[in-house]
Amino acid sequence: MIITTWIMYIFARKTVGLPFPPRVNSDIEVEESEAVSVVQHWLNKTEEEASRSIREKMSINDSPTHGHDIHVTRDLVKHHLSKSDMLTDPSQEVLEERTRIQFIRWSHTRIFQVPSEVMDDVMQERIDQVRRSVSHLMCDSYNDPSFRTSCSEC
């Protein structure tokens, strides 16, 4: 009976000329200016600390250590958006792009110089760290009553 009802529903929609499944745009634009400014402040602070740290490490580690092969686990990505660029084009799109680039850059561009002998150990340690982090997030969201309520509505 359920299958027959669905078949009739689909047939009726196609007969009338409506698509199945219905095209519904469920994405709603939400702008949280306070959250954006907090993230932007955090990213600027992290950017300054990271650039200072990278400059120090690069000046200290100009040559390979003890003749070992050196592997860099992340490439250093350089983006040249400065505050003067923001003043010339203060649109929201540029601000969002800059925030996105900074977040990606500083969350993925830590430079770790590792001798080739310990490369596998370092990679396994990083994988375990990510798994623990994901597991922790899943446990936190499961224990959050508002998350369970929103999931039960799905």
Swiss-Prot record:
Claim: Membrane is one of the keywords in the record: yes
Keywords: Cell projection, Cilium, Developmental protein, Differentiation, Flagellum, Membrane, Mitochondrion, Mitochondrion outer membrane, Phosphoprotein, Spermatogenesis, Transit peptide
InterPro entries: SPATA19
Expression sites by tissue: Expressed specifically in adult testis (at protein level).
Cell compartments where the protein resides: Mitochondrion outer membrane; Mitochondrion; Cell projection, Cilium, Flagellum
Mutant phenotype after disruption: Male mice are infertile, their sperms exhibit disorganized mitochondrial structure and the sperm-abundance of mitochondrial proteins and activities of mitochondrial respiratory chain complex IV, and ATP levels are significantly reduced. Epididymal sperm possess seriously disrupted midpieces, leading to a severe reduction in sperm motility and infertility.
Designated name of the protein: Spermatogenesis-associated protein 19, mitochondrial
Gene: Spata19
